[in-house]
Regions:
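Conserved small/polar residues in nucleotide/adenosyl-binding loops
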Residues: 154-161
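Conserved N-terminal beta1-alpha1 strand-loop-helix module at the mouth
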Residues: 1-107, 112-115
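Short beta->alpha connector loops at strand-helix junctions that form conserved
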Residues: 94-95, 121-122, 143-146
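Catalytic cores of alpha/beta
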Residues: 127-132
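Glycine-enriched alpha-helix->loop->beta-strand junction motifs that scaffold or abut catalytic
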Residues: 87, 114-116, 135-141
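Short glycine/proline-centered loop/turn elements that form peptide/ligand docking sites
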Residues: 100, 149-150
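Glycine- and Gly-Pro-enriched alpha-helical subdomains that act as flexible
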Residues: 116-126
Length: 161
């Protein structure tokens, strides 16, 4: 019997295949190379630690499979600016469309709205998504160990940008 996570990963594989058909790995790699250097996600956390402060990675999420719509009036750029004003250390942006109603466009528009380091929170299963994350403004990505084999984890780490 397929678990819910297995279903999500199968859907993600189809989505990534569609994205690759629309924009090649070479094209997205080029966009990633042309994008701004990443902001220091870990450096931001270390700086807070050195100041004796707690780091907060604030999440921007419209919905979840278990809770449904979390925030009906969802203005991701405004939420990001509010978090920045309240001194969040970094932001975590949900980009999975099918199950969390996220979007890469949220990541891109938030990048243009705030100066904080951004984490793309998605089900990363392919190197394409690493370059895509950078091209859309992410400073780091989430890798979920339970969906990756040791080999695929090592392969994805080899494509750090």
């Amino acid at each position: 019997m397929q678990s819910y996570l297995d279903k999500i990963i199968a859907t993600k594989a189809l989505v990534v295949a569609e994205q690759k058909a629309q924009e090649s790995l070479k094209e997205i790699h080029s966009k990633a190379s042309d994008s701004s250097p990443p902001k220091g996600f870990i450096d931001a956390i270390r700086k807070r630690d050195q100041q004796g402060l707690v780091s907060v990675i604030a999440e921007i999420k419209k919905a979840s499979p278990s809770k449904g719509i979390i925030r009906k009036e969802f203005l991701p750029e405004e939420i990001a600016r509010q978090y920045e004003r309240k001194n969040a250390t970094c932001l975590s942006i949900l980009t999975d469309e099918e199950y969390f109603q996220g979007s890469l466009n949220y990541l891109e528009s938030i990048r243009a709205s705030v100066n904080l380091p951004l984490l793309r929170k998605d089900f990363t299963i392919d190197e394409y998504q690493i370059y895509q994350s950078k091209a859309y403004g992410a400073d780091c990505i989430l890798l979920i160990a339970s969906v990756l084999t040791a080999v695929s984890y090592t392969h994805l780490r080899a494509h750090e940008t």
